[in-house]
C-alpha cells in the first residue's frame, strides 16, 4: 500500500552567503517521504536560486503532481532537475538501491579569511584538499591568496571555483600571482572564464587544470577528453535524476576524468544522501559537500559531528 508525505521548509542562512550577486537569506525547499508497506524513502527538492531553472514554487507544484501520480501507481519521474533528483532519491531509498555507506569527508570550503582555512587544514587527517571560491574579489587578490595557501601548506591540493567570473585578461592576472612551481597542486579550477573556449585557452597557457561544472547543464555539452581538462563537478540537484547522475559519472570515468559529487547548498538530509551517492558512485574521490556551516539548523537527518540543532519532521510544514 503506497502512501506519501510532502513537507515544506525554510532554513535561515548565515549573513554572508552570496550567490550570483544576490544574498541568500534563507534556504527554501521540500521533502518527500514515500512509503510502500514497511519500507520508506526520503528525498529533498531544493532548487538553488540563480542556478536552477525552476523556482521553489514551480518545484512544489511539480512534486505534488508527481506524488499524486505515484500514489496511483505511476512509475515515471518529473522533468524538473531538482524534483527529478529528490523523487529518484526517495525511490532509491524505498527500493534499497541507494547504499547506506557514506563518505562524510568533505573538502573544507574557504569563502573568506584564508587563515581560518589554514587552521582547519592543520587538523585534517590524510590528504589535504580544500576548495576556494575565486572570482568574488579582484583576480590579483585571488591569486595571492591561493599562492599563500599553497606556500603555507606544502602537501595541500586546492580545488578552485570561479563560476565563469573572469575575462581571459582577469584569468591571466590571477595566474600571474600563482608561482608556477605550485600550479600542479591546483587539482582543478572550475570554469575560469565566461566561455568554454576561453577556459580551454587559459588551461593551455597557464598549465592550470580546469574542470567543467555549469557546462554539463548546457545543451551542446559533450563529454570529451581534452587537453587541460581534468575533472567534472556534478551537482545532482541541478542535474536531475539519480540515473542521469550515474550516466554522467560513468561518462567522465570512461575518459579518465575525475568526477566530483558536489553540493547545491542542500539541507543536512540532502547532504547525507549526497555523501552516500559519493561513496557509491565516486569512491576514493573527496566530495564537495562542505556547505552545512552556511546554515543555522539541520533537519530530519543530522550530519555526523555537526553541533547545529536538528529539527524533526513534526516541526516542518506538511503539505500532504
From Swiss-Prot:
Its cofactor is a divalent metal cation. Belongs to the mandelate racemase/muconate lactonizing enzyme family. MenC type 1 subfamily. It comes from the Bacteria. CDD domains: OSBS. PANTHER family: O-SUCCINYLBENZOATE SYNTHASE, O-SUCCINYLBENZOATE SYNTHASE-RELATED. GO terms for molecular function: magnesium ion binding; O-succinylbenzoate synthase activity. InterPro entries: Enolase-like_C_sf, Enolase-like_N, Enolase_C-like, Mandelate_racemase_C, OSB_synthase_MenC1, OSBS_N. It is an enzyme of class 4 (lyase). The keyword Cell membrane does not apply. Keywords: Lyase, Magnesium, Menaquinone biosynthesis, Metal-binding. It catalyses: (1R,6R)-6-hydroxy-2-succinyl-cyclohexa-2,4-diene-1-carboxylate = 2-succinylbenzoate + H2O. Its EC number is 4.2.1.113. The active site is at residues 133, 235. GO terms for biological process: menaquinone biosynthetic process. The keyword Transferase does not apply. Converts 2-succinyl-6-hydroxy-2,4-cyclohexadiene-1-carboxylate (SHCHC) to 2-succinylbenzoate (OSB). Pathway: Quinol/quinone metabolism; 1,4-dihydroxy-2-naphthoate biosynthesis; 1,4-dihydroxy-2-naphthoate from chorismate: step 4/7; Quinol/quinone metabolism; menaquinone biosynthesis. This is o-succinylbenzoate synthase. Mg(2+) binds at residues 161, 190, 213.
